[in-house]
């Protein structure tokens, strides 16, 4: 059974259909990448997974239960499906350590000592423990990304979803984040990632989903999508900028 199963997902904003019958599955331990042109519905799809955006119709099953139901405990769902935002969403007035421990203390009701221990574990795993007393403004973009990931992992989610994790990073930092994703994947962390970056996508996942105008048009390796797919729009998207070797 898939950890997350999306069936016929539709999201409309007034008369504008952003997602139009999306179907996909995410398996335990899988790292799934979603790509597509700007405005195709990628970020909206992620936000539907933990009800940051309410679907218009369709179902999203998490561990076999439809989480679009009105009876769903949305707060518990958001602890199970962690979200790492494009701009990291760190609290500027809190240290790195306190950014990670805040939800542990407020939502999981951990003592400060317990929360500090958990935060130290996650920050150490991401090579950020030496920065635990710094403030976000003292960190590089890549370091901020690691703090945001540590904060999500500290809640022990079943899935972590990432919205454009490399959009604010230079090429060196992008490689570092790719290495981090691969390490987390080896640790059996289940992830779904939206990205516009073909090189990054190739570094972290064999296959990608292509979303266009709210519809899943294809799922395959970037190489096959760029050269062998029957849809010219798909070939053009994945063959752009010489990203296919």
Residue ranges and their predicted role:
Residues 135-139, 143:
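Conserved ABC ATPase signature
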Residues 154-158:
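A short, proline-enriched helix->beta-strand linker immediately N-terminal to the Walker B motif
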Residues 66, 108, 112-130, 179:
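Conserved ABC ATPase "signature" region
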Residues 50:
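Helix-to-loop junction immediately C-terminal to a conserved catalytic motif
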Residues 67-82, 112-113, 186, 226-229:
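ABC ATPase NBD coupling module
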Residues 160-163:
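Catalytic Walker B motif of ABC-type/P-loop ATPase nucleotide-binding domains
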């Amino acid at each position: 059974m898939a950890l997350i199963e999306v069936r016929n997902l539709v999201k409309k904003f007034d008369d504008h259909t952003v997602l139009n019958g999306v179907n996909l599955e995410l398996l335990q331990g899988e790292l799934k990448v979603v790509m597509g042109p700007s405005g195709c519905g990628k970020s909206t799809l992620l936000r539907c997974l933990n009800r940051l955006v309410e679907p218009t119709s369709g179902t999203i099953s998490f561990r076999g239960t439809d989480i679009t139901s009105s009876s769903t405990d949305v707060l518990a769902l958001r602890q199970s499906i962690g979200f790492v935002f494009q701009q990291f969403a760190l609290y500027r007035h809190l240290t790195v350590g306190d950014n990670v421990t805040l939800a542990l203390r407020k939502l999981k009701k951990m003592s400060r000592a317990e929360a500090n221990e958990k935060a130290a574990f996650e920050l150490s795993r991401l090579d950020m423990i030496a920065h635990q007393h710094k403030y976000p403004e003292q960190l590089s973009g890549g370091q901020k990304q690691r703090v945001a990931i540590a904060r999500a992992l500290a809640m022990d989610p079943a899935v972590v979803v990432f919205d454009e994790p490399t959009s604010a990073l230079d090429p060196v930092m992008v490689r570092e984040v790719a290495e981090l994703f691969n390490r987390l994947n080896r640790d059996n962390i289940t992830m779904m990632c939206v990205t516009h970056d073909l090189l990054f996508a190739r570094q972290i996942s064999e296959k990608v989903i292509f979303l266009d105008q709210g519809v899943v048009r294809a799922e395959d390796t970037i190489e096959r999508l760029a050269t062998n797919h029957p849809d010219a729009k798909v070939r053009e998207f994945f063959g752009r900028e010489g990203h296919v070797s």
